[in-house]
């Protein structure tokens, strides 16, 4: 294995249609996820740095903290360049792409939400309220349901990706990372403070 390329995390947000920004902005990459076809890599930026971003989030926060929102970036893996950015919430952490390549899901730690981005429309189409500190996300292979860990609480959120309605699974304190078994029959969760 060898290093093929290094992609700088700085972007000109204005060139992507965000006219209130000028100049280059540096991100702070956290986690990534591939598109199902392997053409793209999406990564979350904990924060953005540059003119207009003045209040970087922290791990102890709430929506009332007033921290800056951030962006999800997309790398075109044929050129190793950032070719798209999407506005998300404050302190985005986990990103997952649905297996049918319909949605990109981002957990926003300080906003207490999950951003739903339509791949076809290339924009955020829904912001789903979760509760304190949304973290891990997994999606069933048929792209019917997403599960989100509410790390600041004691439950998982099951989101119907057709309607965006939620049901809840009580699980115990501080669920963090989630993994689905290959047959989608068992959902595993790490408990941060258990």
Describe each model-derived feature in a short phrase:
Residues 1-194:
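Predominantly soluble domains enriched in secretory-pathway, periplasmic, or organellar proteins
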């Amino acid at each position: 294995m060898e290093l093929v390329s290094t992609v700088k995390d700085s972007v000109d947000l204005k060139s992507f249609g965000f006219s209130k920004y000028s100049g280059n902005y540096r991100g702070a990459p956290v986690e990534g996820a591939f598109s199902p076809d392997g053409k793209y890599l999406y990564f979350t930026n904990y924060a953005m740095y540059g003119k207009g971003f003045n209040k970087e989030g922290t791990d102890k926060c709430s929506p009332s903290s007033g921290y800056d929102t951030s962006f999800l970036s997309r790398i075109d893996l044929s050129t190793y360049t950032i070719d798209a950015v999407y506005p998300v919430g404050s302190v985005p952490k986990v990103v997952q792409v649905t297996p049918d390549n319909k949605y990109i899901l981002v957990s926003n730690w300080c906003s207490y939400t999950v951003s739903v981005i339509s791949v076809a429309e290339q924009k955020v189409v829904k912001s789903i309220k979760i509760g304190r500190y949304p973290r891990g996300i997994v999606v069933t292979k048929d792209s019917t349901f997403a599960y989100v860990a509410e790390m600041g609480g004691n439950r998982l959120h099951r989101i119907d990706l057709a309607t965006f309605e939620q049901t809840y699974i009580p699980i115990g304190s501080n669920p963090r990372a989630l993994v689905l078994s290959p047959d989608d029959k068992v959902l595993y969760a790490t408990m941060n403070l258990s």
